[in-house]
Amino acid sequence: MSRVATSDPSVTARTVAVHAPNGGEGGSVELPGGVFDVPLNIPLIHQVVVAQLAAARQGTHDTKTRGEVRGGGRKPYRQKGTGRARQGSLRAPQFTGGGTVHGPTPRRYDQRTPKKMKAAALRGALSDRARNNRVHVVSSLVSGETPSTKSAVTALRTIADTRRVLVVASRSDELTWKSLRNVAAVHLLDPGQLNTYDVLVSDDVVFIEDALAAFLARDTRPATSTAGTEAAAGTEGVAGAEENK
């Protein structure tokens, strides 16, 4: 993961090239500044990522107390006259095979995180990658209509030759999904699944062109009066994506 930038540049739209499967450029596309060029809030990103990882925990851990362990129903020896410390059960915590004191029990680790906070964290993570020229757009990764892992990986390496790449492709794009779903260094996500954690743990983010359009157009509700100068389409698109997490 690259070092996150802490600069606070003015919010401006970015123009990036649209790459073709053969490695050439087939035009350009504009990345809205409200999504790809916003100030980075590291404490916010930390809070959102911690909450996301906590929510992924199963929480099914369980231990048995002295009342749940099998056996230990009778008093091991009489109360007085033995010279030993009095004991009431062989399943007390101090005995081998006894119950556990204050052990973990099933619980939920969910943390409530407002949608706007998750959306802002995702914008910050995407902006950091964009400022370091690590957000790319491709028209397609495979030429033709037949899935090809070799062709897709070759095209991907000409764009982002890094250790871990996040590829955002629509679910309907079976060509991309079938070509890359078995590549260990590539993580595939639908536009609606895009989240802060996966952006941060990836070195580069590669959008298929139609997936980028779907991400930015997702849930395009008009901006409210308190939204300030946020780009309505881009901001709500991020919120819509994080809502599914």
Curated annotation (Swiss-Prot):
Sequence ranges of Basic residues compositional bias: 72-83
Compositionally biased region (Polar residues): 1-13
GO molecular function, one term: rRNA binding
GO biological process: translation
One Gene Ontology cellular component annotation held by this UniProt entry: ribonucleoprotein complex
Bias (Basic and acidic residues) ranges: 59-71
Keywords: Ribonucleoprotein, Ribosomal protein, RNA-binding, rRNA-binding
Chain segments carrying region Disordered: 1-28, 56-114, 224-245
Record InterPro entries: Ribosomal_uL4, Ribosomal_uL4-like, Ribosomal_uL4_dom_sf
Gene3D superfamilies: 3.40.1370.10
Source domain of life: Bacteria
PANTHER family: 50S RIBOSOMAL PROTEIN L4, LARGE RIBOSOMAL SUBUNIT PROTEIN UL4M
Self-association state and partner proteins as the record states: Part of the 50S ribosomal subunit.
Free-text function comment from the UniProt entry: One of the primary rRNA binding proteins, this protein initially binds near the 5'-end of the 23S rRNA. It is important during the early stages of 50S assembly. It makes multiple contacts with different domains of the 23S rRNA in the assembled 50S subunit and ribosome.
HAMAP family in UniProt: Ribosomal_uL4_B (MF_01328_B)
Annotated family: Belongs to the universal ribosomal protein uL4 family.
Protein name: Large ribosomal subunit protein uL4
Species the sequence originates in: Frankia casuarinae (strain DSM 45818 / CECT 9043 / HFP020203 / CcI3)
